[in-house]
């Protein structure tokens, strides 16, 4: 019996795959539990159109991510002022939210905090640090962060 998988199954395949399985397995397990549907002509056409649409969306997301990286590549380094204690250690830390906010201000594009990845955890010391800006899992760029002491006069 021919079926279309609605979700990824370890022993069978990925979502959207068209497979032949034993009819009892399909009727008694896959279809009643919502893991597959019968592979009729209409369902096959629908799945093919759905896959094409998902591929177009993926290409669009990747192109948007690449344009974001190009805009950020023009920024040499980002200076973030922070309150500093003894021996250059920060009060608190500079997190992904702070870096995303500063990058958004400098590049005029919206950057979400989950697009920032740290190489060694949150930044807790004054100095030069590197973080990864990753708007899509296949597109990333390394960004220089310079944390400086905030003036106490303000």
Swiss-Prot record:
One of its GO terms (cellular component) is ribonucleoprotein complex. It comes from the Bacteria. GO terms for biological process: translation. Gene3D superfamilies: Ribosomal protein L9, C-terminal domain, Ribosomal protein L9, N-terminal domain. InterPro entries: Ribosomal_bL9 (IPR000244), Ribosomal_bL9/RNase_H1_N (IPR009027), Ribosomal_bL9_bac/chp (IPR020594), Ribosomal_bL9_C (IPR020069), Ribosomal_bL9_C_sf (IPR036791), Ribosomal_bL9_N (IPR020070), Ribosomal_bL9_N_sf (IPR036935). Keywords: Ribonucleoprotein, Ribosomal protein, RNA-binding, rRNA-binding. One of its GO terms (molecular function) is rRNA binding. NCBIfam families: L9. Belongs to the bacterial ribosomal protein bL9 family. HAMAP family: Ribosomal_bL9. Binds to the 23S rRNA. This is Large ribosomal subunit protein bL9. It comes from Buchnera aphidicola subsp. Baizongia pistaciae (strain Bp).
């Amino acid at each position: 019996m021919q079926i279309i998988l609605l979700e990824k199954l370890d022993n069978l395949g990925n979502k959207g795959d068209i497979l032949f399985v034993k009819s009892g397995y399909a009727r008694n397990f896959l279809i009643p539990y919502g893991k597959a549907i019968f592979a009729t002509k209409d369902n096959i056409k629908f799945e093919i159109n759905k896959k094409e649409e998902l591929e177009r969306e993926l290409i669009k997301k990747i192109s948007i991510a690449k344009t974001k990286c190009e805009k950020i590549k023009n920024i040499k380094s980002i200076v973030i002022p922070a309150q500093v204690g003894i021996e250059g250690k920060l009060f608190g830390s500079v997190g992904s939210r702070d870096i995303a906010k500063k990058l958004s201000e400098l590049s005029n594009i919206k950057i979400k905090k989950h697009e920032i990845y740290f190489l060694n955890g949150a930044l807790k010391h004054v100095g030069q640090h590197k973080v990864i800006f990753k708007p899509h899992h296949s597109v990333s760029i390394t960004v220089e962060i310079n944390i400086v002491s905030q003036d106490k006069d303000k």
